[in-house]
Every structure is written in structure tokens, then in C-alpha cells.
Amino acid sequence: MISPNPAGITLDTSDGRSNGLHMRQDSGSRAVVVCNPVIPGFYPDPSICRVGEDYYLATSSFEYFPGVPIFHSRDLVHWRQLGHALDRRSQLPLDESGTSGGIYAPTLRYHQGRFYMITTNVSHHGSPSGGNFLVHTTDPSGPWSEPIWLDQEGIDPDIFFDHDGTVYVTSSGRSDGRCRIVQSTFTLDLERGVAERNEPVVDLWDGTGGRGPEAPHIYSIDGVYYLMIAEGGTEDGHMVTIARGSSPRGPWDVCPRNPILSNRSLDRPLQATGHGDLVQSPDRSWWMVMLATRPTGYHRVHVLGRETCLAPVRWDTEGWPVVGKHGELPHEATWRLPHRLQRWPEEPARDDFDADQLGHKWNHLYNPIPDAYSLVERPGWLTLHARSESLASGSRPTWLGQRQTAFDQVVTALLDFEPQDEGDEAGLVAWQNHEHHYEIARTVRSGNPVLIVRRQIGSLSAVVSEIEETDPSKPVQLRVSTSKTHYRFAYSHDGDAWAEIASGESRYLSSEVGGLFTGVYFAIYSLSGSKEPPPSRFDWFEAT
């Protein structure tokens, strides 16, 4: 059986509301103050594995491309992005994904020298049973293989390689009209790129009574099999529960202290805690990554999306995991880490578009149209070629964005764009989805070149500010400044004198009001209804 508290982890929990995203190290010790989230912004549904001294982590990505960001850490707290598991259209067709479609939760595992990432494209059925598939590689920075589709229903698939070579795929499915955890075994042929199901899918566990059992993970620890899942929905009732048995098939002995993690009904900065995954460090200590939200305001809404967090795990005398101190996730706590801190070089806040390809932070909305984006047409600039789709159309606009990662953020872009006709438009948008966004843009209205701020809230769209421009041939700097309560929009022609022209309340871009499973992006975009639209050129984009 597992030894209780194998790493001697000590906790000093705190619910301080600092905006720190990493930690401070105490002198002469590995005890550090860790501030959750460890990966801020819309990076939900984390899954983790370890290879030697290195940790790798994957998250879901929904309708954004490339999909499934892959992160690397050597201390569990400082993470750098290596790339994406799904960076080709052949791996990730998103034509019919829509808002919060596309890629749901992944599981990332390492087995016999190879990484496996298994997930669901809920908008694409690659097998008779739906959109579950896996990709694999020997290098987590890529490239990853083409999808191997799995004939098993549901979402949130887990892949487990047992000691006898059996490969178990466990997912959240439906049986007899109920959501429950289901499972089958597969034979993988990586050379042929096929996976053959060996048996009918069987019901595995209904959970403990919370709605929507999902996010299953199976572990073999000291000869005991543990099945850990999420329940309660991914909102404030979210929780992690666990059971164990002598086989990956059960029968299951349910933990008497379930849920082992939940902040439900607690006055804590972090909410919706759940969807956990376990990893053991070289010193035999155990850790869990999970998602959480940071709601604000009287209505307790969040705009940053579900974010990746960390907590230590100890094992009690009965062999059950204890997450954190009492199954709660703190925003800030002092923990003894299994490694010395290993920070990565700071990424530049500004992208000058001087490289021959975009960095890992950038995402397209759905699959991009290749001819709509160019880094070589005007060297040192990113050129966007407009499409006729509006931001509210629900289709594929020319759109390129980065996640909002903090409450207080300033995002600025320099735009060179001369609109010719009504409908020609380019600018900077704070984006939740097609129905909820705020943008500042250069366009033409009533025959005059203007700067506008538009608010789209559900089916209501309104230009709330309009400033006539005397010389649209000159580049303009566009800025969005954020706080917990508002997005504020400003412009400048020289970078020194700024004019704020409008604002919008943050809550209308929140997941509770306007979204489903994603967080806010800041994106540059270009629109036009003309047959030969003028190009939109961006010299740089900066997020601080």
C-alpha cells in the first residue's frame, strides 16, 4: 500500500488575492509560495505525464487552431509551450465546430519511449462512434502523427497501458440514457495507423451521484488500480472523485471522503475546481494538476476561461489521496517542491512579426485560409487579407489572436490600413465568441474614414463611439486595456498621446453570460465585402 505523505509535504494555505502567477522561493529551502493558476488564461482540462526530470502537459483547445498546446516544465510551476499536438488540418478539421466545438479534454501519456495524446473532436466523426482519436510521437515538440480513430463513443478519453500490455480506453459516454464512465480495450497498430476494438464497450462507473461524470483517468499504484473522474459539471459544482479496485475493470471501492477536491460552496478566489490528473515526482511525492476559474464581481463571473492549477497530494493511512490540505484548492500556498526552481527565459511581450512563422501563442479561429495571412508580403509586418464574413457571422473571418492571461492587461497593435468602401474594416477585438465581443477598428461609415468601437452582446450590436479620421493613410495604434470590471478602448497616432473613446463591461464577455467553455482572446482581424479588399498590415502586437 502507498506510504502516507511520502514527500513530507507541509502546507500553509492562504487565500490571498495577489495577482502573482509564479512563486517566491524562501532562502535556503525548496519551500515556495505557489500562486495558482500556474498556467494562466484559457488552458483547461490539463493532463500531465513525467519522463525522467521533465514534465509534459496538454490542455484542450476547442475551436481554435492549432490545437492541444503542449507544455514542458522541470519544477511543476514554470511552464513553457513547446508547440501543439494538432497543427495540421488533416489532424484537426474544424469546419463545422462552431462555438465551443472542436477539441475537448486530452489525456497525455508516455509509454515505452513514445508520447500518446488521446482526445475528442466533438465536431468531426472520424469513426462510426464519433470523434475520439489518438496521435503519437517520440518528440513532444512535434511533429505528431496523423489521427488514429477509435471506435468508442463519448468524450474525455483516457488511455491506460497495463503491465500485461492491455490498452484500455476509458471515456465519458452514455448508456441507457445516462451519462456514465465507459471502457473498452484496443489493439494498436501504429505503423498501419489503426486501432481495433477488442470487445464491446462496457459500463464502468456512474460516479458518486454528481451530474456529468467525465474526465476519467486510470492509474496503477502499488498493485491497486485507481479510477479518478470529475463530476458535478464544469461550473461551480465541479469536483474530483475517486474509486479503486483490483482490476482496471473494477469492481470499485469508492473513497469515503469523496469528493477529494472541490471548492464548491466555499468563499475562495478559485472556483469550479476539477478535472484533475495525477503525476509522481522522482522523490516519490505526488501532485495533481486541475482546472479552476477566477470569478470576480458581485455576479461572480469569469472571463479568463478555465485555467491550469497545481496542488500537492499525500496518501492517508487507508491508501486514499488527500489533495492540498483538506481537498480545497488555494490561490496561494507554501509548498515544498520536489525540484529546485527552473525558470524559462521570459517571452517577449511584443511580436514584431520579423520571424518566418508565428509563435506558439497565436491561434486562428477554426482552420485558417492560408492566403489570408502573410509574413513575407511586406517584410516585418503581418498582412491580413479580408474575407466577407463578419465577426458575428459564425463562420471563418480573417482573425488571429492570443489568450487574455491576466485581469489587468494592456494590448496594443499598430495598424496600417486604408479602407476604401463601407464594410472595409480592420482592428483589434476582445473576443469571447461570435455573439460576444468588443472591437476598436478603422473603417468607412457614411463615406468617411472613421475609428469605431462596437459592442456585440448576444443579438444586439451597436457602434458606441465613432471618431472621424483626417488622414487614414497614416498608421494608427489601437489599444485595449483591461481590468476586472471593464475593457477600455483607445487610439494614438504617435504612441504618446492616447484618446480613450469607449469601454465595455467585462461581464458581458464572461463564460457565464456569453460563453460556454472558452476564455477571452485578443485578436487582430480584417473584414470586407469588396471583391478586391485593401490589405490590413500590422507592424507589431504587444500584450503586457
Please annotate each region the language model reported.
Residues 1-544:
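Carbohydrate-active catalytic/glycan-binding domains of CAZyme proteins
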